[in-house]
Amino acid sequence: MNLINELKKKIIQNKKFIFNNKNHDLVDELKKKGILNNNILDAFNKIPRELFVNEKFANLSYENIPLPIDCEQTISQPYVVAFMIDCLKLKKINSVLEIGTGTGYQTALLAHLCKQVYTIEIFSKLYNQAKINHHKLKLKNINHMLGNGINGWNKNILFDAIIISATTESCPNKLLESLKNGGKIIFPKKYDFETQKLILLEKINKNKYITKTLFDVRFVPLLNKKST
């Protein structure tokens, strides 16, 4: 069973068990799970997740679970999003590249935490949804691209951090080349037997990286094709 079908099955099984109704409920849960960065918690408080989920799952917007979106993709579990962002140790002066915009929830969080966000989405439907969502929130520091994230931004920009929202067997070389020395990249790595683990890389120079393996996750695959 693929990830999307698993999510739908779990939602049907647990639809009566709703614990979080508002942003502050979700933020309280994130605190209990160890997310203590006040800037990240403030971003979660400000961004309405309900804007980014499908209408039929609106009542689950603030649950700490991933949810299906269009194009057989997902909006990630809030705790995993918060943890990944926390690992990057972002500053307000930073520029971040995001691979996999989806409907733009994580992008919006990043926009509150750094100077510029560059985000690439392969599906035109999601690309357009995200742009609309960000316009509604009046976020001015997000740069959108419709394309294959494996190819990077295709411009002479080096990033302080890169976050990949889909699983891959290895980090694409063009993304590694786009990272500044001292920068961090976080992504879910695919292993055998459908195992995935979150990986954090810190770039020392073009030939040296510090690698940290974190915990098991489940993400949709990183696609290598033309945008659709």
Residue ranges, per PLM feature:
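Short, solvent-exposed coil/turn segments at beta-strand boundaries
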Residues: 206, 225-226
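Conserved nucleotide-cofactor-binding alpha/beta core module
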Residues: 89-209
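Class I SAM-dependent transferase core
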Residues: 2-97, 105-109, 113, 126-140, ...
